[in-house]
Swiss-Prot record:
Disulfide bonds: none
Subcellular location, record wording: Cytoplasm
Cell membrane recorded as keyword: no
Name the UniProt record assigns to this protein: DNA replication and repair protein RecF
Organism: Synechocystis sp. (strain ATCC 27184 / PCC 6803 / Kazusa)
Length: 384
C-alpha cells in the first residue's frame, strides 16, 4: 500500500496543508514543536482511529476552529481509496471512504495499515501493563478490525459491571447478604463479561503466538544472537488449549473465587483488562533487569516483527512511522533498522537533523521541511 496524498485542515497546528508523497521514504525535518509528530499522528488516526497522545478529539482540532479534517489518497494493490476523518471539537467524528459515510468504525478500520515507532515505545518494556495491553490491542485491530468492536463491547461491559459492584459494595460491607435481584443482576453481567472476555483473550493469545517467533528472530539478528528473547502472554484468567468452552469455565471459576474481593473493592478484578505481556531475555525479565540498550533492542525487534506479521496477514506491506526514534538508537541499531526498511515499506520519518542519515538515504528520500505547521519540499543540500 502507498499513501499518495495527505490533506490536513485545522488539525493540531496545521491550518491547511496538502502533501503529495513522491518516494518510498519521506523525511520530515525541523525543530521541535513545529508539527512533525502531528503529521504522523494524522496517519496513525487513519490507520487505527486512535492517537497514542490523546483520547479527546477536541485536542486534535486547531485552537479557534470548530472542526478539523484529515483526508488521504491511498493506493492499494488492487484499489484506490480516498479516506476522510472529520473531527469536531464537540460531537462525534464522521468517517468517509470514497465520499461515502461509514456507519461503523469497523467499516473504516483496515483500509490503511501502519506501524508507529516513537521514543514513547520504550514504555512497552519498562512501563505499566496497560502500555503493553494497548500495544497488543492496536496490533490486533490492524490484523482483524472486528477486534476493535469486540474490545469496545468488553470495555463497556466492565464499566457497567463496575457501576453495579460499586453500588453493592456498601451493602456487602455492612454484612448484609445480596438480595435476589442484586444476585441476578450480577450473574447477568458475569455471563456477558465471560462471553466477551473469552473472545478477547483467545484473539490475544493467538496474535501473540504468531508475533513471538518473529520478534525472537528479529531480536537475534539485531543482538547478534547474544541473547534469546521470549515473549509470553500472561492472561489474568489462565487455561490450557484454545477451546472456548474451556476458557469460559476457567473465567467463571475465577469470578467465583474473586467474588468477595470484587464486592469489597467495588470493581472488576477478573478479565483481560488485567492481562500482562512478558518479555524475557534469556532467563531475565527485561522490564526490571534489562539495560536501556537491551530494552531498545527489544522494542526495535517488536516493531520489525509487527511489520512482518501485518504484511503476512493483509498481503501488503504496511506504512512505517518513525517519530524521532533515531535519536534513541545507537549507530548500530540505526543501521539495523534502516537496512530492514530499505524500500520495502513506505516510511515517514521525523528528525531534527538530516545528518543522522547517510548520503544514500538522503538522496533517495523525499525531504519535507516542517515549520510552524507548514510544509516545504527541500533538497538535502538546503538543510543542515
Amino acid at each position: 500500500m502507498y499513501l499518495k496524498k495527505l490533506y490536513l485542515r485545522a488539525f493540531r497546528n496545521y491550518l491547511e496543508e496538502e502533501v503529495e508523497f513522491s518516494a518510498q521514504k519521506t523525511i520530515l525535518v525541523g525543530n521541535n514543536a513545529q508539527g512533525k509528530s502531528n503529521l504522523l499522528e494524522a496517519v496513525e488516526l487513519l490507520a487505527t482511529l486512535k492517537s497514542h497522545r490523546t483520547s479527546r478529539d477536541q485536542e486534535l482540532v486547531l485552537d479557534g476552529a470548530a472542526n478539523g479534517q484529515i483526508k488521504a489518497l491511498l493506493e492499494r494493490q488492487y484499489s484506490v481509496a480516498e479516506l476522510e476523518i472529520d473531527l469536531r471539537r464537540s460531537g462525534r467524528r464522521n468517517l468517509r471512504i470514497n465520499q461515502n459515510q461509514c456507519r461503523r468504525q469497523l467499516d473504516f478500520l483496515g483500509c490503511l495499515n501502519a506501524v508507529e515507532f516513537s521514543c514513547l515505545d520504550l514504555d512497552l518494556v519498562r512501563g505499566a501493563p496497560d502500555c503493553r495491553r494497548q500495544w497488543l490491542d492496536t496490533l490486533l485491530t490492524q490484523l482483524e478490525p472486528l477486534y476493535a468492536h469486540l474490545l469496545g463491547q468488553y470495555q463497556h461491559i466492565v464499566k457497567q459491571r463496575n457501576a453495579l459492584l460499586k453500588s453493592l459494595r456498601q451493602q456487602w460491607e455492612t454484612g448484609l447478604a445480596l438480595g435476589e435481584e442484586s444476585t441476578a443482576s450480577l450473574s447477568l453481567w458475569d455471563q456477558q463479561l465471560v462471553e466477551m472476555g473469552t473472545r478477547v483473550v483467545r484473539r490475544r493469545a493467538r496474535g501473540l503466538a504468531r508475533l513471538a517467533p518473529l520478534a525472537q528472530e528479529w531480536h537475534g539478528r539485531i543482538s547478534g544472537g547474544n541473547e534469546t528473547l521470549t515473549v509470553t502472554y500472561q492472561p489474568n484468567v489462565t487455561w490450557v488449549g484454545d477451546d472456548p468452552e474451556v476458557v469460559h469455565q476457567a473465567f467463571l471459576e475465577k469470578l467465583a473465587q474473586r467474588r468477595s474481593a470484587e464486592l469489597h473493592l467495588g470493581t472488576t478484578v477478573v478479565g483481560p483488562h488485567r492481562d500482562e505481556v512478558g518479555f524475557v531475555l534469556d532467563d531475565t525479565p527485561a522490564r526490571t533487569y534489562g539495560s536501556q540498550g537491551q530494552q531498545r533492542t527489544l522494542v526495535l525487534a517488536l516493531k520489525l516483527a509487527e511489520l512482518s506479521l501485518i504484511e503476512t496477514v493483509i498481503g501488503e506491506p504496511p506504512l512505517l512511522l518513525l517519530d524521532d526514534v533515531l535519536a534513541e538508537l545507537d549507530l548500530d541499531r540505526q543501521g539495523q533498522l534502516l537496512m530492514a526498511i530499505e524500500d520495502r515499506f513506505q516510511t515517514l520519518i521525523t528528525t531534527t537533523h538530516l545528518s543522522r542519515f547517510d548520503d544514500r538515504w538522503r538522496r533517495s528520500a523525499q525531504i519535507l521541511k516542517v515549520n510552524a505547521g507548514q510544509l516545504e519540499e527541500r533538497w538535502p543540500s538546503e538543510i543542515d
